[in-house]
Amino acid sequence: MRCVPVFIILLLLSPSAPSVDAHPMTKDDVPQASLHDDAKRTLQVPWMKRGCCAMLTCCVGR
């Protein structure tokens, strides 16, 4: 039971994310790539270098 007040105080002290973007996007801003886009790009590069498809059916004869 001693942990509950400490946990509540820590929750109150933690900063919350703003509900609105603090800096409005301008025409010079470039959208950031998401983690999903980075992972997808990383996984696609080896397939392109080998010339194989994702199902490995076209790699069988090589």
Swiss-Prot record:
Post-translational modification as stated in the protein's UniProt record: Contains 2 disulfide bonds that can be either 'C1-C3, C2-C4' or 'C1-C4, C2-C3', since these disulfide connectivities have been observed for conotoxins with cysteine framework V (for examples, see AC P0DQQ7 and AC P81755).
Source superkingdom: Eukaryota
Record key words, sorted: Amidation, Cleavage on pair of basic residues, Disulfide bond, Neurotoxin, Secreted, Signal, Toxin
Disulfide bridge partners, by residue number: none
Leader sequence residues: 1-22
Main location: secreted
Pfam families, alphabetized: Chi-conotoxin (PF16981)
Compartment annotation: Secreted
Entry GO terms, CC: extracellular region
Expression sites by tissue: Expressed by the venom duct.
Propeptide section residues: 23-48
Transmembrane segments: none
Entry-annotated residues carrying Valine amide: 60
Stored InterPro entries: T-conotoxin
Gene Ontology MF terms: toxin activity
Family listed: Belongs to the conotoxin T superfamily.
Entry note about domains: The cysteine framework is V (CC-CC).
Protein name from the UniProt record: Conotoxin Qc5.2
Species name: Conus quercinus
